[in-house]
């Protein structure tokens, strides 16, 4: 543990073995866990509020959750487990709210092929998660000759009719969040960071990068009120991009699209042509261990279907996995907040096959990087989903007591060797 939130803290530095107040190390770690989950919920709630959607019940939980971690309020480990599970439930509620906000505003996502590569002309690259910021940027760049490209978690924006209607939404440049320094250095474009997943910029593009909303970087101009005039002016000043050879990615598989295939999916499963579904995704990590997810998907047999979401998909979304009688073997469900689509899909499959969720031909292979993934993990645990795999490493705040609880109650398993894990899952 490491706690220094009150004046009693040991030597005025930190309590690292046991709190002077009596707080046990596991309680301290569970408090951290709750705060991480609350941070994740707050990110999704922020983006819903951008579009005018709020939830008083979620707001009230955030107040109670934060308050519970104050000094001398709650010393009960079991209560903090319950609060973490409640945080998972509140995160599901928040993701549903954000999904409604996105669909009400931009329409139901549709499968869409996205160009990956530059076109000739001045350019702006938008990174992060804010569809609202992207929409305002597209409005303000109409008729300017500027091509707007998405990066990382804004890729799914191309699937929304209300955003795809802008012809100058030109495609995608780069991949996951951690490639941005190379991507932004490579292209002479103006850059907009709209949310989390921005990195401290290199000097060679710092003067052409801007932030908005919650994002902020030292030495980078922050734009208030969605007024992107300085960003647009910078894009027009810079040398235009040259057209380059391009590839394509497919995104935009909303729940309704998948449910339209329900009868065919049931037929293929009952006929043994689809053996199992694998939900492989989450936050990507630059750790070498994250190569596991690439190898895992590459080694899956051809009678399996891969569902993916968030930036973890960049580990394998360029693979051509083909289809099984018209059902794509690789289905991109969207951003990390679109984990709600995965949750709803699990429930839909349970109804389709009249099975308990833990009896479904479905395995979940999670990758995590930061606090939003912690919120999503507790969302899945709140549904009593068992047998999930998690990587690239176990969360650092989970000590032996917490790991034992997760293993004993939910059969949560650290990723191992891809081939061995597949063999174990498929029997």
UniProtKB/Swiss-Prot annotation:
It is an enzyme of class 1 (oxidoreductase). Hybrid [4Fe-2O-2S] cluster binds at residues 129, 153, 197, 283, 311, 336, 370, 372. It catalyses: A + NH4(+) + H2O = hydroxylamine + AH2 + H(+). Its main location: cytoplasm. Its EC number is 1.7.99.1. Keywords: 4Fe-4S, Cytoplasm, Iron, Iron-sulfur, Metal-binding, Oxidoreductase. Binds 1 [4Fe-4S] cluster. GO terms for molecular function: 4 iron, 4 sulfur cluster binding; hydroxylamine reductase activity; metal ion binding; peroxidase activity. Belongs to the HCP family. Catalyzes the reduction of hydroxylamine to form NH(3) and H(2)O. This is Hydroxylamine reductase.
